[in-house]
A protein has these predicted regions:
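Glycoside hydrolase catalytic-domain context in secreted enzymes
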Residues: 18-476, 481-484, 489-493, 501-799, ...
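Short beta-strand elements
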Residues: 824-835
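Flexible, membrane-facing loop/turn or short amphipathic-helix motifs
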Residues: 802-803
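Bacterial Sec-dependent N-terminal signal peptides
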Residues: 1-21
Length: 835
């Protein structure tokens, strides 16, 4: 019978194309399922799977992180950070990224992508800002909606996350985000609403944090009242991994507990059903949502077509996003683009020059199938027209250089290059080994795959042995980056010890060696769970004083300093400082004092404290994290092949004290939190006292000059705005206004301009001085002019009424403001909404 039912399911898959057919199949399955089978569906399995119902032929369905590409199943296209996508202000590129990720999911048999990530950028220090789309709900919502449509075009489920107000990583499981009702509706929920109602997202992931004292996964107001009833969401709600803390989630509206059912299991639910504390209809609704979504996207069909992925085309999408997302923040005296003969010799230096990070850390990190760092990309693009020199200002060389310089042999006679590698199916390096081979280098990102044939994909260990002979006497640096544990021995002496479970971490050790002596080398490594990776290398320690290295900069026409954060500093599970490390700020200051043509390349997921050096350098590019595009688009912009068109999706304060979250996030910009929780026994909260005055709304309301305003970004050309037209100029509350304006490229280069439409409501209800309501990006040749059209619907004019808990359009005057940024308004005109 089981086989017959399974064959029936397979037969039905191709014809379940209408909502009515899908509901009929869901009802048929519900009628056949036992309560135990229904409950089994409510918890995940194997880390990233929805369970199946084998008796009915319903298969498991696979999920994967994350927003910047597919984290599972080896290498995939690694797209630029979400914040870089938002900085493009390009809805089409958001769709193209989603479409590419959806295609790759199909190729890898993944049914759910845990993306997009779309929490509001509240403070620069949030470790996951790099994944998100900035500080404004309109920009966030439109970017997310187009991303979702791209993903789901491929019959892959997009999962919008993290619902809601997950705006800090510090103690994210227990610190309550305490948000007033108007701010919650107008700022923090608004983007999700757009992604669901306009984008059609079929899955929502509840956040780790409590909202107003109640964990999001157990918050009935959030999941049932707002999401499912008021918004009409018919998809499924899953928890973030380990985000459920009690059986309250059952009646709150959570449908799927991930990665497994700790609370939504039969041991808990069946007694609650018998006691009348949970209704059968509640369980049926959860199962119905899971089955409906999977059937809608054809995820139960074993014969789903796997498209042939055009990896080069997807790389081009990633490259285009990076090109349009990089923001030119400063370009004094038009130093950029670099051109001969004014600039012929260029020095590149800084911690991120060679060790260029592709992404922040955590579940959003993707293993790219190609990558080029800043130094190599700039050097390649410069060709023979420029002389480019890398100057290492770090104590230790980059990992890329260390690996290239390392020379190891598998025999003491130094005849056979490489390491002898032995693999074990345990984490203790205990015999017997299950595989052996010779590796030319130790530079592996195994991910979730097995490191060798016959070896497990988790809970394994590797021992590499080799021999080497130093080329000179002196101190050498030994470096290892690993996930999880690593130990390095030289002639039996333990010189580097990082033997524990951890995310990717870099460790360095120094040891004096003698020229001409043959040394024995041993590297032990284990991976207990999750993705495995290890890189190792060694080289002579360059002890040339930094002052000597920097003095040479006076001989170069320009100096490019690569500073910022990386996956270890900025990522999931922790927050990062507002300021760059002291040594990086000092490096920029020293370089700019020696070379007047100093250019800063900043790698970060948001704003920083620019004050230590912004007035001393000539040019600044905010590159965010560029994924596998790496240094290529940066080089293209530096030399003028690409005209920068990115604009900031967040505001940057001149100092942390000016920020809207100051006083209820971190004190004085230091790394230490102002709150401490003892978890569930003494939960604490962060009060969002700025309410609706987030980001640029705060700076406008309090008349504070930011370092760089929301929507700001320079170009190598200039744009002129004109002829603002509103039609009609008077409407009723349910009316619509059409807005038109002209934009002309009055410069000498082709370029693109992100045109921003803001509204100021001159009503009795207090509103911010301006709020973004729409945007568009226009591409113009020199001298070319185009007309842009926007539509202001009632939804874009609504304000949330906290007295009657409803959305309303208020009567009064409304001012339309068309700008190049939130502080560069070019055109204004009013219209009237009558009572």
């Amino acid at each position: 019978m089981k086989r017959i039912l399974g064959l029936i399911v397979l037969f039905l898959m191709p014809v379940l194309s209408t909502a009515a057919n899908i509901e009929r199949q869901v009802n048929a399955w519900l009628a056949q399922m036992t309560m135990e089978e229904k409950i089994e569906l409510l918890g995940g399995t194997k880390g990233f799977f929805i369970k199946g119902v084998p008796r009915l032929g319903i298969p498991e369905v696979k999920m994967s992180d994350g927003p910047l590409g597919i984290r599972a199943n080896g290498k995939s296209t690694a797209f630029p950070a979400g914040i870089a996508l938002a900085a493009t202000w390009n809805k089409h590129l958001a769709f193209e990224e989603g479409n590419a990720i959806g295609q790759e999911c199909r190729e890898k048999n993944i049914g759910f992508i845990l993306a997009p990530a779309m929490n509001i950028y509240r403070a620069a220090m949030d470790g996951r800002n790099f994944e998100y789309f900035g500080e404004d709900p309109c920009l966030t919502g439109q970017t997310a909606a187009n991303y979702v449509q791209g993903v789901q075009k491929n019959k892959v489920v997009a999962t919008v996350k993290h619902f809601v107000a997950n705006n800090q990583e510090y103690d994210r499981h227990w610190v309550s985000s305490n948000v007033d009702e108007r701010a919650l509706r107008e700022i923090y929920l608004a983007g999700f609403k757009t992604a669901i109602q306009q984008g059609g997202a079929l899955a929502v992931m509840s956040a780790y944090n409590p909202l107003n004292g109640i964990h999001c996964s157990e918050n009935k107001t959030l999941l049932t009242k707002i999401l499912k009833k008021q918004w009409g969401f018919t998809g499924l709600v899953m928890s973030d991994w380990g985000a459920v803390h009690s059986t309250a989630a059952i009646n709150a509206g959570l449908d799927l507990e991930m990665p497994r059912a700790r609370y939504m299991n039969k041991e808990n639910i069946i007694p609650l059903l018998k006691a009348g504390k949970v209704d059968t209809a509640t369980i049926d609704d959860k199962v119905r949502r899971i089955l409906r979504v999977c059937l809608t996207m054809d995820l139960f069909n074993p014969n789903r077509e796997k498209p042939a992925v055009d990896w080069d085309a997807h790389h081009q999408v990633a490259l285009n996003i990076a090109r349009e997302g990089i923001v030119l923040l400063k370009n004094e005296d038009d130093l950029l683009p670099l051109s001969a003969p004014a600039i012929k010799t260029i020095a590149i230096l800084g911690p991120n020059a060679e060790d260029t990070p592709s992404s922040g850390g955590g579940s959003a990190h993707v293993k790219p199938y190609r990558f080029v760092n800043f130094v190599d990309a700039i050097t390649k693009r410069a060709g023979t027209n420029f002389k480019v020199t890398f100057i290492n200002t770090n104590r230790y060389p980059s990992f890329a250089r260390l690996i290239r310089q390392t020379r190891v042999f598998s025999d003491p006679q130094l005849k056979t290059p490489g390491y002898t590698a032995v693999f074990f199916n345990n984490t203790r390096l205990t015999f017997p080994p299950v595989a052996r081979r010779v590796d030319p280098s130790i530079n592996f990102d195994f991910g979730a795959l097995a490191p060798a044939f016959g070896v497990r994909s988790q809970n394994y260990s590797i021992r590499w042995r080799g021999f080497f002979k130093p080329s000179k006497s002196g101190k050498y640096v030994f470096a290892a980056e690993s996930d999880d544990g690593v130990r390095v021995y030289v002639n039996g002496e333990l010189v580097l010890d990082n033997w524990s479970d951890h995310a990717p971490e870099k460790r360095f050790a120094e040891k004096a060696l003698k020229k001409g002596k043959v040394y024995r080398l041993r590297i032990d490594y284990y991976n207990s769970h999750g993705g495995g990776m290890i890189r190792f290398g060694f080289a002579p320690l360059d002890e040339t004083p930094l002052s000597t290295k920097l003095a040479a900069l006076k001989n170069y026409d320009a100096a490019i300093v690569c500073v910022g954060f990386n996956a270890q500093v900025e990522g999931e599970g922790h927050d990062r400082p507002f300021a760059l490390p002291k040594e990086q700020n000092e490096l920029v200051q020293k370089v700019s004092a020696i070379n007047k043509h100093t250019i800063v390349l900043l790698t970060a997921g948001g704003g920083i404290d620019f004050s230590p050096w912004i007035d001393e350098v000539q040019a600044v590019l905010h590159t965010f994290y560029l994924g596998q595009a790496g240094g290529t688009p940066v080089a293209e912009i530096l030399f003028g092949d690409v005209n920068p068109s990115g604009k900031l999706p967040f505001s940057v304060p001149k100092r942390w004290q000016d920020a809207p979250a100051y006083g209820h996030y971190y004190p004085e910009g230091e790394a230490g939190p102002i709150y401490k929780s003892n978890h569930k026994d003494h939960p604490v909260g962060v009060n969002y006292d700025e309410s609706i005055l987030t980001g640029y709304r705060h700076y406008d309301q309090l008349k504070i000059e930011p370092q760089f305003p929301f929507g700001f970004g320079l170009s190598y050309t200039q744009f002129e705005y004109s002829d603002l037209q509103l039609s009609p100029r008077q409407i009723e509350k349910d009316g619509t206004v059409t807005v038109r304006c002209k934009v002309k490229n009055i410069g000498s280069r082709a370029g693109a301009e992100a045109v921003q439409l803001y509204i100021h409501a001159e009503t009795r209800v207090p509103t911010p001085p301006k709020e973004l309501k729409d945007f568009d990006k226009v591409y113009l040749k020199p001298g070319e002019e185009k007309t842009l059209t926007f539509t202001l619907t009632p939804e874009k004019l609504q304000i949330y009424n906290i007295q009657n808990h409803e959305w309303e359009v208020k009567a009064g005057k409304y001012e339309v403001l068309i700008g190049a940024s939130s502080r560069d308004i070019r055109l204004k005109k009013r219209f009237l909404v009558t009572p």
